Amino acid sequence: MTPAELSELITETARTTLDAHGLDSSVVPESATVERPRNPEHGDYATNIAMQVAKKAGTNPREFGTWLAESLGAHEGIDEATVAGPGFINIRLAAAAQGKIVEDILTVGANFGHGDELAGAAINLEFVSANPTGPIHLGGTRWAAVGDSLGRVLNARGAKVTREYYFNDHGAQIDRFARSLVAAAKGEPTPEDGYGGDYIQDIASQIVEANPDWQKLGADEAQELFRSQGVELMFAHIKRTLAEFGTEFDVYFHENSLFESGAVEAAIQKIKDNGNLYEADGAWWLRSTNFGDDKDRVVIKSDGNAAYIAGDIAYVADKFDRGHNLCIYMLGADHHGYIARLRAAAAAMGYDPQQVEVLIGQLVNLVKDGKAVRMSKRAGTVITLDDLVEAIGVDAARYAMIRSSVDSSLDIDMDLWASKSNDNPVFYVQYAHARLCSLARKAEDLGVTREGADLSLLTHDREGDLIRTLGEFPAVVKTAAELREPHRVARYAESLAGTFHRFYDACQILPKPSDDEQTVAENKALFAARLSLAAASRQTLANALELLGVAAPERM
């Protein structure tokens, strides 16, 4: 019985118990909180539902708790239910009910941890969206890992997710990029407001090689040549880097297409027509304060050019018009002001601003030999995704980025994450998976199978710990999806790995070479049960790593 199944049983029993005593059962919530007690001697799980609903139902927590514990204790899957303190109910599962978790995992396999509570959600998940003016930096790397993992988690709980990259190929930064490339091609210094680094010279050299007569062009033509081909080459590099990092997108949306298609012009006209745009000081302003922003925003500047928010307005409308009912933006630490701005853009266009979510990721710092690493030879001024992968590998880079909440800044110790030690979280988790695979191979060599497993024999404390940890996985994934926090899956994987290692050290899973035939025969059902528990652990660990986009190696 998983915690989710136990929660359902508790709520059903609470309703029938209140009905039986002539009390109001409508006060029982849809789900009951089920937690592991701090002291294992108190039982496998505990719930505070009696304290939540007793007063509303017309009784006191202790009395209702006593009734409920008695009813729960009569259930075949529960060995014991007792009331403690002001009304806590401690529950100990029957051995067979605990073992059923193992059976369920082995039955559903790769789908263990999946659910359907987000069925019907069509989510546009936009992340990374780095400017095509340079390689992806550490902030973008964090979103490349976290965004991809979040997409996997949301999919696992039933949502249809479109992973989208907004390609900022319109605006002044592209002009500066083009001027930087032209300067590099001419052997001139980088413009004061331009972009430097080896990658600029590399791209400029590629354009020169492909266009040997470029110097015959006029200044404007040369600028346009380096602009268009430079953006194309940078875009190809970004896509290749992301693919090698294990991050794929369903849609690469070009900002410039919003202007070329007339979408920006149409959006501006729409908000003019609905009264959400007004003219002042020679410019046109969005009444964004009407929708919770701290100030109105310029949409058309006094020189007649569209401000950046004009593209945002057209873009959010395009997302909803494509059939999405939730738009999640994953933005950098310097984008806090965009939360109200993007919601105002949606509201001004007639969409529900509550269907716009903005996640803000904090800064990432690298540390090596105890010192901050700040420079990249490749990019000139910042550390890139390519630099990080070269130093510690894809799996370590992804795991390091995902395992902490994006609400806090992140320091990555490159020496730690490159090490092959249990102090390295990704090594620790992957080693547990490899150890489980090795165990399965050894069982096959010995002729030990899961056939005839009696899961009710799994009564050792370490077995119980492992089973309960396995049972938590669906709730962990569900919460990770609800809160947009895939780091919960990474922390769970570490907890599961540690719980498995303790089980492995405490319980004999396979026959020893010194065991005689009689001993092996007498323990056949137990060995099969423990091998089943190990197989369920391997499956769950593999499922967690899949949600993180991290490899689950069979050998290390």
From Swiss-Prot:
Compartments where found: Cytoplasm
GO biological process: arginyl-tRNA aminoacylation
Listed PROSITE patterns: AA_TRNA_LIGASE_I
One function term, GO molecular function aspect: ATP binding
Motif segment ('HIGH' region): 130-140
Top-level taxonomic group: Bacteria
Record key words, sorted: Aminoacyl-tRNA synthetase, ATP-binding, Cytoplasm, Ligase, Nucleotide-binding, Protein biosynthesis
Reaction equation(s) it catalyzes: tRNA(Arg) + L-arginine + ATP = L-arginyl-tRNA(Arg) + AMP + diphosphate
UniProt-listed Pfam families: Arg_tRNA_synt_N, DALR_1, tRNA-synt_1d
SMART domains: Arg_tRNA_synt_N (SM01016), DALR_1 (SM00836)
Assigned GO CC terms: cytoplasm
Its EC number(s): 6.1.1.19
Main location group: cytoplasm
HAMAP family given in the database record: Arg_tRNA_synth
NCBIfam families to which the protein is assigned, alphabetical: argS (TIGR00456)
Similarity section: Belongs to the class-I aminoacyl-tRNA synthetase family.
Subunit architecture: Monomer.
Record protein name field: Arginine--tRNA ligase
Organism listed in the record: Corynebacterium jeikeium (strain K411)
